[in-house]
Amino acid sequence: MKFSENWLRNHVPIQANRDVLVATLTAIGLEVENVAVLGEALDLIVVARIVNVVPHPESDRLQICQVDAAQDTLLQIVCGASNVRPGLVVPLALLGAKIGALTIKSTTLRGVESNGMLCSAKELGLDTEASGLMELPDDAPIGTPLADYLALPDASIEIKLTPNRADCFSVRGIAFDVAAACASEVTPLHIDEIPAVSARTLPVELHAGANAPRYCGCVIEGIDPAAPTPVWMAERLRRSGIRPVSLLVDITQYVMLELGQPMHAFDVDTLRGPIGVRLSRNDEALKLLDGRTVVLDNDFLVVTDADQPIALAGLIGGWETRITDTTVNVFLEAAHFAPVAIMGRGRKLGLHTDASHRFERGVDPALPPQAIAFATRLILELAGGKPGSLIRVELPEYLPAPASILLRRTRIARLLGIVIDDVEVERILHALGMQVTTQAEGWRVVAPSRRFDIAIEEDLIEELVRIRGYEHLPTALPIGASHIAMPSETRLDMTSVRRQLIARELQETINYAFIDAELLRRWQLNTGQVMLMNPLSAELAVIRPRLLPGLVAALGRNIARQLERVRLFELGNVFTASDEAGAAPLETQHVAAAVCGDAFALQWGEQARKVDFYDLKGDLESLAAASGAVLTFHSSAQPWGHPGRSADVWCDDTCIGWIGQLHPALTQTLEINVDVIAFELALEPLVRGALPRAHALSRFPFVRRDLACVVPEHVTWSELAITVRDVIGSLLRDVKLFDRYVGKGIEPGFKSLAIGLILQDDTRTLIDRDVDDIMAKVVMAIQQRHDVRIRS
């Protein structure tokens, strides 16, 4: 099914952009196979009229045209199209317009100046199979931008439908699903019956029982056979994969695409009556619209005139009663044919039509009278005429009845494993066009007549989860043989985490998950402990709430064995007591590291220095960068941390851990006589990241500005950096702290920070005035938020 995006949006008002719409369609089961964007680059292309055409003196194929584009003078354009002629209204690309990679310029062709280009639909990307100039209606307003005239830009969206979703072979059918998924509502379609003006009618007889239980029609006299298809209708058809033919045929196709009801139009002057629907007889012959004559068996459903076949019902019309260029009186047909009566018949004859594709899967039995009224109104508006009364013949006992289903709350919860709010259930069902009545145990739901796929309670539950999204269902690990899967590109596995830390010269340790309660008391972690009922020993009586106590104890044992430079890490689970009485402990996975000694191994090319906070912070940021996680650091008040040399680590507005130097009082009680730098974080936020995206390098130069400021001691560099990023936004490529000074010239309680800012725009070169304005805003923001003073 192919349709116009703008056409769909006319039926369901949604704010979602095209990408979101396409993703939504696929998510709710209407798989998008292709999206062809139309008319996104039609600047300087206008509607124009060819006033005069003369042959080119130096070429047999070229013509010299004088073209009216609503400018002061006519434009001279050389054109080689076969259908160029005076009076023709066509798209004109003015000088400076771009057609693909071609920029239209004034040029000379065989000695004759040409100041523009007359365009075909193919050149404009509107029709890949078109040839010759695109011919516009004579009444198209000259000088109007073509994009405005053709309601562009637009997109032709093609979706792949499963056999059970025949209701989505129409724009309105798709609109109901989109409305439900996007929390919108389908625009009501008011189709009033057209009052009869003509008394002409045709008798109809149904002799096929359940195969054809409803047949509707209408005779319209005195239409204008020369009336053209309006451009808005032709474009909607073209963008839906149907080439416009003639007004009457186009109207039947348009109604089919909008409502989902296949129709056929007969030249009423070729009919004698009565019209009938019956099964074919062996060896009956019929000449089809495609010019072939076929011989039928007794298994085809046929429309007859005076008991003679004139059409294959639900497949294709006949040659003798076809609409021609001279047809002025027409009989419109819209009927309900059962899928079993149409299925497989086309294959017998090598036929596959839009009508058969729909009837084989099921068409809404309530549509025929609406389709007749809609098509009649369009014909009267576009071609005039006098309509007769609606012809409506039915066999009520054979018409399919909509399913009435009890939907229970308990059944929803049992099948899905979740509870869906009553308001949400009713919203989804109403948006899908269902009648919903509240009952004590749930709802009584009547499915719309177009939804043949809804028959039982489970079908309704499927609709709820399909629209809400399967991602909201709880998941469980499958039971059975495991299979090797491709690693996720947006998530680090444990092996990658280990490799990343090992690459930073850290060594993995594995410690007991049980720990001494006395050790936790020294760390002031003796609240919320999970005690073992049957511990192995008194020293292993508590399940560890954090990794650091055991990891630092291991570091202390290494120091006691005369190792001066120790760098350890651990991955493992930690346990905390649940707030709910009797509930199992909460188990989460953490990563921790502890280092001491020299920053680098002893060597002649590097001056020896002790490891510090910033060294381990770099190791942590390297791990975060591997997954794309963004970390920020804020002042910490953890009792085991050194005041002023530790920080809480945040990710996505959540505190996930701690980093810093251990408090000297703690290391003293642990009998560790060196400074220990450590971190511990919840692992999940670190390993969950976004898929990296490549961005083109800007071809414009960057600008660096440095800022020296005096900052209160309690204000952290992280807080300043956040403020700078908030103020500058996307123009800020990087911000670095390259100097920190405390001492002479700086009053107590303050520090001097030197900040480097890199600014760059992807679309233009930043000038001094731009940069000065940005820097002024930065200075004002940090002064107001952080009581900063700028150093001169």
UniProtKB/Swiss-Prot annotation:
Annotated InterPro entries: aa-tRNA-synth_II/BPL/LPL, B3/B4_tRNA-bd, DNA-bd_dom_put_sf, Fdx_antiC-bd, Fdx_antiC-bd_sf, NA-bd_OB-fold, Phe-tRNA-ligase_IIc_bsu, Phe-tRNA-ligase_IIc_bsu_bact
Cell compartments where the protein resides: Cytoplasm
Quaternary structure, from the entry: Tetramer of two alpha and two beta subunits.
Sites where the protein binds Mg(2+): D453, D459, E462, E463
Domain FDX-ACB: 698-791
Chief subcellular location: cytoplasm
Record organism: Xylella fastidiosa (strain 9a5c)
Enzyme Commission no: 6.1.1.20
The protein's name: Phenylalanine--tRNA ligase beta subunit
The UniProt record lists the keyword Cell wall biogenesis/degradation: no
NCBIfam families in UniProt: pheT_bact, YtpR
Keyword match 4Fe-4S: no
Family: Belongs to the phenylalanyl-tRNA synthetase beta subunit family. Type 1 subfamily.
EC category: ligase
GO molecular function: ATP binding; magnesium ion binding; phenylalanine-tRNA ligase activity; tRNA binding
GO cellular component: a single term: phenylalanine-tRNA ligase complex
SUPFAM superfamilies registered for this protein in UniProt: Anticodon-binding domain of PheRS (SSF54991), Class II aaRS and biotin synthetases (SSF55681), Nucleic acid-binding proteins (SSF50249), PheT/TilS domain (SSF56037), Putative DNA-binding domain (SSF46955)
